[in-house]
C-alpha cells in the first residue's frame, strides 16, 4: 500500500511541474514586442518592450529553478532523506511539538541555503539588468539573517 501512495505523490509532483512548465512556455511563446491596442495609450513602446523582456527573463529563470527544485524534491523523496531526518529529529527530543518544529526548521534552513544562489542570481543579475534592484550584497545577507532570527 505504501508503494501506491509513493506513486501518487510522485505523479502529482511531476504533473504539477509539467503543467506549470507548459504554462510558462506558453507565456514565453506569446511574448511580443508589439504593444496591444488596448495598452497603446497607457504604455509607450520602449517601456512595453522592456516589460516583455523582463517577463521573458523571469519566466525562463523560473523554468530553470523549478526544474532544479523538482529534481531535488524527487531525489530527496526517492533517497529516503526525509526518513533519515525524521530519525535524527526523534532522537533529539521526545516532545512531538519540538520534533515537528525542528523537522520543519531544518528543512526550511536547508531549502533556503540551497536556493541561495538562485535568489542571488535573481536579485543581482536579472533585477539589476532591468533596474529594479536597489539592494546590496551586504543588505541581502543582513535580511537573510534577520529572516532566520524571526523564524527562530
Region locations from a protein language model:
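Hydrophobic or amphipathic, alpha-helical segments that drive membrane association/targeting
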Residues: 1-152
Amino acid at each position: 500500500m505504501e508503494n501506491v501512495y509513493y506513486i501518487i505523490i510522485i505523479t502529482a509532483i511531476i504533473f504539477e511541474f509539467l503543467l506549470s512548465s507548459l504554462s510558462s512556455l506558453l507565456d514565453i511563446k506569446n511574448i511580443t514586442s508589439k504593444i496591444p491596442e488596448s495598452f497603446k495609450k497607457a504604455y509607450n513602446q520602449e517601456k512595453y518592450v522592456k516589460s516583455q523582456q523582463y517577463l521573458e527573463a523571469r519566466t525562463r529563470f523560473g523554468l530553470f529553478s523549478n526544474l532544479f527544485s523538482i529534481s531535488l524534491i524527487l531525489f530527496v523523496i526517492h533517497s529516503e532523506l526525509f526518513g533519515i531526518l525524521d530519525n535524527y529529529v526523534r532522537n533529539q527530543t521526545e516532545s512531538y511539538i519540538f520534533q515537528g518544529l525542528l523537522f520543519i526548521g531544518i528543512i526550511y534552513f536547508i531549502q533556503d541555503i540551497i536556493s541561495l544562489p538562485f535568489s542571488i542570481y535573481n536579485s543581482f543579475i536579472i533585477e539589476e539588468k532591468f533596474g529594479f534592484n536597489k539592494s546590496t550584497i551586504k543588505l541581502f545577507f543582513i535580511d537573510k539573517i534577520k529572516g532566520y532570527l524571526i523564524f527562530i
